[in-house]
């Protein structure tokens, strides 16, 4: 029987981090809608790589939101430590996930081809 612990931990961290970003961070730089698309926690629970999508039309606003997220990583880590009981509280590393923007761009291109 395979061990699904890693997947369960990833999903639990994803749910909690998303909740913290949406409801508990009070940074005025977080103006865009932010979605946690994936979380990958290392097997030794030392690091958690968090992939986020930032929905904004302005590139500078995306950068400001991403910078605000990076600066809030310590706060997020502290709250996670209080909510999730694991041996090590992982260090949070944010990565920008542009896959949703890329998919929207491809969809626009397909629509243009269909219209011709």
Swiss-Prot record:
Record protein name field: Ribosome-binding factor A
Family assignment from sequence similarity: Belongs to the RbfA family.
A GO cellular-component term linked to this record: cytosol
PANTHER family: RIBOSOME-BINDING FACTOR A, CHLOROPLASTIC-RELATED
Domain of life: Bacteria
Localization in the cell: Cytoplasm
One Pfam family cited in the UniProt record for this chain: RBFA
Gene3D superfamilies per record: 3.30.300.20
Gene Ontology molecular-function annotations: ribosomal small subunit binding
Entry keyword annotation includes Cytoplasm: yes
Role this protein plays: One of several proteins that assist in the late maturation steps of the functional core of the 30S ribosomal subunit. Associates with free 30S ribosomal subunits (but not with 30S subunits that are part of 70S ribosomes or polysomes). Required for efficient processing of 16S rRNA. May interact with the 5'-terminal helix region of 16S rRNA.
Record-level GO BP terms: maturation of SSU-rRNA
NCBIfam families per UniProt: rbfA
Subunit structure: Monomer. Binds 30S ribosomal subunits, but not 50S ribosomal subunits or 70S ribosomes.
InterPro entries in UniProt: KH_dom-like_a/b (IPR015946), RbfA (IPR000238), RbfA_dom_sf (IPR023799)
Record keywords, A-Z: Cytoplasm, Ribosome biogenesis
UniProt gene name: rbfA
């Amino acid at each position: 029987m395979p061990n699904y612990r890693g997947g369960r931990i990833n999903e639990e961290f994803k749910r909690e981090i998303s909740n913290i970003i949406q409801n508990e961070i009070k940074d005025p730089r977080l103006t865009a809608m932010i979605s946690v698309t994936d979380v990958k926690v290392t097997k030794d629970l030392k690091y958690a790589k968090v992939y986020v999508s930032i929905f904004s039309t302005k590139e500078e606003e995306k950068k400001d939101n991403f910078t605000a997220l990076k600066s809030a990583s310590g706060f997020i880590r502290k709250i996670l430590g209080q909510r999730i009981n694991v041996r090590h509280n992982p260090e949070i590393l944010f990565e920008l996930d542009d896959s949703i923007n890329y998919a929207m761009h491809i969809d626009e291109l397909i629509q243009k081809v269909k219209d011709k």
